[in-house]
Structures are given as C-alpha cells and as structure tokens.
Amino acid sequence: RACREKPEDEGARLDAAGLTYPCYCTRREIREAASAPHDGPVPDGAYPGTCRGLTPRERAEREAAGRPPALRLRADVGPVTVDDVLLGEFSAVVDDVVLRRNDGVPAYNLAVVVDDAAQGVDQVVRGDDLASSTPRQAHLADLLGLPRPTWAHVPLVLGPSGQRLAKRDGAVTLPELAALGVSALDVLRILAVSLRLALPGEPVRAADLVDRFEPVLLPTVPWVLDPGSGRSVT
C-alpha cells in the first residue's frame, strides 16, 4: 500500500493492534541486560525483552517512579531474511525494537521505514554499518503493509587506525587535500580505484566511469585511506 501516514500514526496502529508494550529500561539497564548471558535466539547486543512481561502493578510502580516509557515492538517472529545487492541474502532475528522513544519522538527504525515509503523511495544505498538494522526495517515494512525497498550496503572508508574515516583524521575535505597538493582529479582517480572502476595510475575522467559502473561489482570490504598523504592504504 501507499503510505501517507506519519511515523507516529503508524506506531499507533501497531499499538492498537496489540503488537507493542511499554519499556521503562534506562540505557544503562539495557546495556547490562543485553551483555548478560541469555537463552533463546536473541542476537548479541539486542534488547532481551526485559519489560515484556511486566504486570500492571509493576508498570504502575515504574510510572510512579517518574520513568516515562518508550514503546517497543513485540517482535514475535523468527529470522527475517533480506536480499542485498552487494551482500546477497542474509538473515537475523528481530528483537523488540523501539518504535517511540521515551520523549515521544518516533525512533529511527520506524521513522525511516515510514518516511521512505511516503516519499516513494524504492532503492536505499548506505554504509554497511547499518546492515544489521535492515531485518528490523524489513519486518516493520511487512507489518505495516509497506513495500520493501532494494538495499545496497556499501563498505565504509576507514582511516589508518581502522576506525571510520572522520574529521579527526584530518585532510578529508577537498580544500585540505588541495593544500597537500592533491587535486580534485587525483581524488576522482583514488575513488575510481577504490570502487574497482579504474586501475592504479590509470588516467580517468568522471565521464569515463559512467559506463563502467556496475553495482554488483563494487567491493564488499572496507577501504582504508591515509588522509594525510591522500593515498589509499588498501
């Protein structure tokens, strides 16, 4: 179906259908519960359902203590499989994801599903650090009767430390690179090589790369860049 609703309205639909429950856990409690050993198929680091079985009295006690609840999905589902352009098929158990934060704001996973559907987004290209969220979003789309987009999760650019490339690594903007003698054309060539669109040392222009682009041939491992030298490490 086409989506013309706001994320909070779609969250209310799931709530009215009995597919949610209030969660009073603090972030610290969630971290501790997620890191503790537990039975069942819940993946490491996922919310283990601490507040799922609270009685009305227990909920009232938490409300009286001044704990505003978040709203969580009661995700009674087995592994959810998604098909990614680069990663292929992969599956994960969906945990009880937050739909509405305890300040009343729709949470990311619900918001991105509803907003993308409302805007007619049918292709999503993003960093592979978000791949683990995709089964959650696929399950939410299915519950809401919304179409799943096509996903393509691309590897990140990392700094020499192996962490995600960031401003703290320095020389990540064109002016900073230009000050090191790295031209815009040099940047284009470095990027082309990293995407397997050109060979090292091959002179290329942007127009040359259009016909070479093929999503399924893109690399699936991170690319490490030394921003101080403007050179690719891997």
Model-flagged regions — what are they?
Residues A2, R13-L14, L140, E176, ...:
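Residues within well-ordered alpha helices
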Residues Y24-C25, W151, V187, E202:
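Residue-level detector of family-conserved "landmark" positions at structurally sensitive sites
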Residues R28-K167, T173-A178, W223-T234:
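Active-site cores that bind ATP or allylic diphosphates and position pyrophosphate for catalysis
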Residues T26-R28, V154, I190, R205:
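Residue-level "edge-of-site" marker
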Residues S161-T234:
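Conserved catalytic-core subdomain
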Residues R1-P41, V125:
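Nucleotidyltransferase catalytic core that binds NTPs
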Residues D15-P22, L144, L195, L199:
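A generic secondary-structure signal for well-formed alpha-helical elements
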